[in-house]
Structure formats: structure tokens, C-alpha cells
């Protein structure tokens, strides 16, 4: 029997099925939410590398930009206020999603505060026991949290349920570890240190310009949020002092509603327009940050051929260790004068920035590394031995040609106390058993 002749539209493969749990903080416009942007880029790049992945995304509503051919979206209403969202875990709805009909080889969670609850429901009320890993782009570290009560302890206890949790920078990891030391013992800190792994948010290789603009306008760009945690007032003070010395430059702040100085411009446009405008800029300014996260604004500029002067701290050295750094306002003004006065030096630094992006910060390379780790987790997942019951399941599939997971569970008559995950792993390790490239898993026997 040749099953390819029976189901010609079905692609048989060793599918890796991933449940993805979100961290949504900007429901007002989901397409602009940082999590949505990251997961969209991750899935897109992972799909470029291989075609045997299926993602189950939990979302507050359907998201058009995430309608990939290998994505199933499940709507779970969520509170919009971040502290409330992080306290709300919808057990009944999550149990519905963790259906007897589905398989999950991995769980990728972006919200540590819910990870223990998710694992608790999954392991104790379903047949599933996959390994957990994930990514966290926001940490409730002191001096950054805007609300009265943070969720830092819940974040740490959740992260301890991960095999690995990616975060933006080593600086961010150090902040988390140092604050955790005030609550947790040494053994826990050692475990936490092993789980947390920096993963830099690189860029699409196609977005890096081939060559720099060698005759840019004398524009200093501050394309970060003009907020306190980005030290915007301090940046303006630097520009005020520079403007007293010279008046041959402008400052572009695209995220500022309106100019607050006569040398400022705040023009705005879509993403394509924004990139074109960056290419006209002379130099960028990356300020001190209270949080020490990854600066997408800086990589936006660098990939468009803009050299940046950056505050001298580890989170910017991770971003471009070959760049120019300032420790104080005086040094910042000196550097800005150097760039504005020496176009040859400016162009050399711009070319170095592009080379750095191409060699160090292509996001697809980061996704390839993550994919290797995902494969490792799948391989390490426990598989049953060649038991009589497992042989029965293989024979059922062979005789029927194909069976769904639900069909198999019903034949077995198992309750939730018997775990299916080790049997799925053994089936996927079997040389003749294949899954399909669809939302609902089916097990085929291929001769």
C-alpha cells in the first residue's frame, strides 16, 4: 500500500508542534505590539529554514499578520492593563485548547508569570508533558516598573519552569540575577543563571543597505521613545549646548508629537519612508537606558548606514562593540562635533556599522541557533521503549493506514493520568511513522 497515492495532498513529515503563549501589552493596536512583531519575525525566519513546524498561537483576537500556513490561532480574551493581564490565567479556556485531538512537542512561552499555571494545567489535566522554553522581553526590575506592585517574584518562579529562557542582553540578565539574589538562595540563582540566555534581536539581512549614503544631511537622529527611561531630557540638554556652539544641524525625533526646539523636526511616515529618512541622517544618538534592553532603534539606524554614538554601557557594547561611546555630556558633544566636522570619519564609521550588522546581527542566524536548541529539547523528551502497547499502536496505524491521535487515545481507553507525550515521541522516532503538515495530527504508516 502506498499512502502517497491515497492522500496526494498530504505531506508526510516528522512535524514538530509548538504551543506559543504570548505576552501582549499593547492591545490597542496589536500589529504594533512588541511581542506580535517578534513572534511574526521568528516564525517567518524559522519557516525559511525548514518546513516541518506547526505553531499554535494563543492570542486575544485574530491577528492577520500571523496567518501563516503553518499557524493555528486560538482566541483567549485578556485584560488590557499589563499588571492585570499578568495576573489573569483563563484555566477553562486553556483546557479547551489543550485538546485530546492535538499534540504539543514543545511549549514556547513569552510570559513567565503564567508558566507555572500553564504547566500545572497541561501536566495535571491532559495527556501532554512537553518541555518548556521561551523568551521574555520585559522584566519587572526595580527602578523601571511604573506600577505600585511588580510581578518580579512570579517571573522568576515561572522562569524556573523553563529549560531555557531567552532575554535581550547580558546587561538585562545581570539586572535580573542581581535582583533575584535578594530573595532566592544560591542553588536557585545557579539554576536561574543556567536558564537565562541572551539572544540579541537582530535584523533581516535583506533590510541591511548595500552601501552607505556618503553625502547625508547634517541630521542627528534620536529615533528612540522620547521618554524618561531613555533619558530624552538629557539628550535635549546635550543638543542645546551643541546648538550654542554651532547651528548647522537638525535633530530628528520621529516619535515626538511636536518639536520643542527650533532645531528639531518630528516628521513621520510608514516603515519604508522611515528607513529612507534614516539613510539621510548624519549620525544617531543612543542614550543611557534605565532598563538596559536591546535597542531596536539603534539597529534600525545602523542597518540603514547611520553610525551611532552610544552611552558607554554593556548593553550597547553587545550591540556594536566597534562603535563610539560616551560617558558624559561633554564626551557626547565632542563626538558629535567630530562626526559633523569630519565626513570621511563619519563614512568610515557608517561602513563599519553595516559590516557589523551583516557579520553579527542577522536575526536568521539567531533563529538557526534557537532551532538547534528546539531539536535538542525534542530529542531529549522521554520516549517509551518498544513495549507491547507501543507495538499495538504501530500495528493499528499500519493496518488502518492512518489514525488521528484522538482515534488512538479512544482505542487505548486512557484517562489523563497516562501520558501520551512519550508515545508520540516514540512514534516520531519510528522509521515508518509520519505526522502531517496540518493543524490536527494524523499518524501515517509509510512503507
Where are these regions (language model features)?
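Acidic donor-binding loop of glycosyltransferase active sites
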Residues: 276-293, 306
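A charged, aromatic-enriched C-terminal amphipathic alpha-helix characteristic of glycosyltransferases
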Residues: 37, 343-382
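N-terminal subdomain of nucleotide-sugar transferases
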Residues: 1-64, 242
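Short His-centered aromatic/hydrophobic patch
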Residues: 109-115
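Active-site proximal beta-strand in glycosyltransferases
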Residues: 106-108, 121-144, 159, 166
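Short hydrophobic beta-strand element within catalytic cores of glycosyltransferases
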Residues: 303, 307-310
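Conserved donor-binding/catalytic core segment of Leloir-type glycosyltransferases
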Residues: 16-21, 166, 203, 209-230, ...
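A short, active-site helix/loop in glycosyltransferases that binds the activated sugar's phosphate group
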Residues: 153, 160-193
Amino acid at each position: 500500500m502506498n499512502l502517497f497515492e491515497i492522500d496526494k495532498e498530504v505531506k508526510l513529515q516528522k512535524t514538530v508542534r509548538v504551543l506559543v503563549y504570548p505576552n501582549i501589552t499593547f492591545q490597542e493596536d496589536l500589529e504594533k505590539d512588541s511581542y506580535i512583531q517578534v513572534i511574526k519575525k521568528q516564525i517567518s525566519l524559522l519557516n525559511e529554514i525548514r518546513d516541518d513546524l506547526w505553531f499554535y498561537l494563543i492570542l486575544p483576537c485574530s491577528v492577520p499578520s500571523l496567518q501563516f500556513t503553518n499557524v493555528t490561532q486560538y482566541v483567549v480574551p485578556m485584560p488590557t492593563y499589563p499588571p492585570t493581564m499578568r495576573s489573569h490565567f483563563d484555566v477553562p479556556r486553556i483546557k479547551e485548547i489543550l485538546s485530546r485531538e492535538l499534540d504539543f512537542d514543545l511549549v514556547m512561552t513569552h510570559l513567565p508569570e503564567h508558566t507555572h499555571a500553564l504547566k500545572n494545567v497541561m501536566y495535571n489535566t491532559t495527556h501532554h508533558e512537553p518541555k518548556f522554553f521561551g523568551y521574555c522581553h520585559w522584566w519587572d526590575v526595580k527602578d523601571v516598573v511604573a506600577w505600585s506592585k511588580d510581578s518580579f517574584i512570579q517571573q522568576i518562579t515561572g522562569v524556573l519552569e523553563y529549560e531555557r529562557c531567552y532575554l535581550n542582553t547580558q546587561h538585562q540578565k545581570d539586572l535580573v540575577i542581581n535582583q533575584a539574589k535578594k530573595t532566592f538562595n544560591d542553588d536557585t540563582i545557579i539554576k536561574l543563571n543556567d536558564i537565562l540566555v541572551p539572544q540579541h534581536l537582530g535584523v533581516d539581512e535583506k533590510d541591511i543597505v548595500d552601501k552607505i549614503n556618503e553625502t547625508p544631511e547634517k541630521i542627528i537622529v534620536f529615533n528612540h521613545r522620547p521618554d524618561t527611561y531613555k533619558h530624552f531630557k538629557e539628550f535635549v540638554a546635550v543638543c542645546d549646548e551643541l546648538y550654542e556652539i554651532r547651528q548647522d544641524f537638525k535633530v530628528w525625533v520621529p516619535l515626538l508629537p511636536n518639536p520643542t526646539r527650533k532645531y528639531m523636526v518630528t516628521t513621520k511616515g510608514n516603515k519604508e519612508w522611515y528607513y529612507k529618512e534614516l539613510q539621510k541622517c548624519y549620525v544617531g544618538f543612543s542614550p543611557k537606558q534605565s532598563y538596559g534592553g536591546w535597542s531596536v532603534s539603534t539597529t534600525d539606524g545602523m542597518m540603514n548606514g547611520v553610525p551611532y554614538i552610544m552611552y558607554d554601557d554593556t548593553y550597547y557594547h553587545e550591540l556594536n562593540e566597534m562603535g563610539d561611546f560616551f560617558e558624559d555630556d561633554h564626551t557626547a558633544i565632542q563626538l558629535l562635533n567630530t562626526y559633523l566636522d569630519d565626513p570621511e570619519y563619519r563614512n568610515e564609521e557608517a561602513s563599519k556599522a553595516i559590516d557589523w550588522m551583516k557579520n553579527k546581527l542577522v536575526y536568521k542566524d539567531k533563529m538557526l541557533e534557537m532551532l538547534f536548541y528546539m531539536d535538542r529539547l525534542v530529542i531529549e523528551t522521554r520516549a517509551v521503549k518498544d513495549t507491547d502497547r507501543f507495538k499495538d499502536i504501530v500495528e493499528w496505524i499500519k493496518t488502518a493506514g492512518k489514525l488521528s491521535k484522538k482515534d488512538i487515545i479512544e482505542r487505548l481507553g486512557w484517562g489523563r493520568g497516562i501520558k501520551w507525550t512519550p508515545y508520540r515521541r516514540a512514534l516520531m522516532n519510528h522509521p515508518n511513522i509520519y505526522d502531517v503538515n496540518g493543524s490536527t495530527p494524523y499518524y501515517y504508516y509509510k512503507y
